[in-house]
Amino acid sequence: MGRPSSGAVGQPKVRKGLWSPEEDEKLYNHIIRHGVGCWSSVPRLAALNRCGKSCRLRWINYLRPDLKRGCFSQQEEDHIVALHQILGNRWSQIASHLPGRTDNEIKNFWNSCIKKKLRQQGIDPATHKPMASADTATAAAALPDAEEEDRKPLCPAVDGSLVPKQPAVFDPFPLCVDYGAGFAEELGAANAAALYGQLCGGKEVADDDAGFGAADYSCVLDVSENLGYGESSSNSSNWNYGGEVGSVLDGEVPHWAKAEPAFAEMERQQQHSPAEQKLSLPCQEQSLLASFDFNLELEPYF
């Protein structure tokens, strides 16, 4: 029942472990007389209690007549380092370039001797590059922002020191100081004229030698005659000045230079007027201003 083991009754047991000098002599004499044949039949023909794989490795690595014995020379060591830099850990290909040396022998010599020598010289055995340069490359890759910050241009600060120059930021509303005071005054006058034109409902503004001329304010203060305001919380009197405002301002011209006496007169009249008349609407205040004499002279504004 089952498959019989190789160590069955009547069959010699396969030996493992170190080879004895007698076994080396039997294998060597058999290969010299009969040559290399089928390795699975060599143990039976050479009267060895070994497997075919063990006989093959023993012949290739230790018993071949062309194998070199002894330590590696300095020339062989340099050759191994140069080949390892190109081929890496391909030991069989490296051994093909070194007659008389096996791949196992070269691998053991690399791990036990050559690798330690390279590290003592400051060379990485895996990359064959100086360890200092490898550390420098790693540090440079880890700090790209610091190098980018160093490459930024510097500009002088207020105290005389150099600070990094800030990038230019787009300003949708640039200042007009670079264009001179005249440009700013013209721009202010143009904006005032445009704003007044919008208040007048799109009507054109008359422009004379002084800058502003007579204008029709009836479009701004056009109040219906039938418009009445309700009673306030403190007085029940009914105000109805809409028609009077339109008739008073018809043909009048404002004089901005003499506005201060007008305001003073308006305050004086309000102080002597009854208490129920002190609360006034914006259109009613304009009607008081329109009753004064305005001329067309304008004083320069700075």
Swiss-Prot record:
Tissue: Germinating seed and apical meristem of shoot and root.
Subcellular location: Nucleus
Keywords: Activator, DNA-binding, Nucleus, Repeat, Transcription, Transcription regulation
Region entry Disordered, spans: 137-158
Any GO MF annotation of the entry: DNA binding
CDD domains, per the entry: SANT (cd00167)
InterPro entries named among the record's database cross-references: Homeodomain-like_sf, Myb_dom, Plant_SW-associated_TFs, SANT/Myb
Domain HTH myb-type: 11-63, 64-118
Pfam families (alphabetical): Myb_DNA-binding
Entry coiled-coil feature ranges: none
Keyword set includes Nucleus: yes
UniProt name for this protein: Myb-related protein Hv33
Species this chain originates from: Hordeum vulgare
Gene name of the record: MYB2
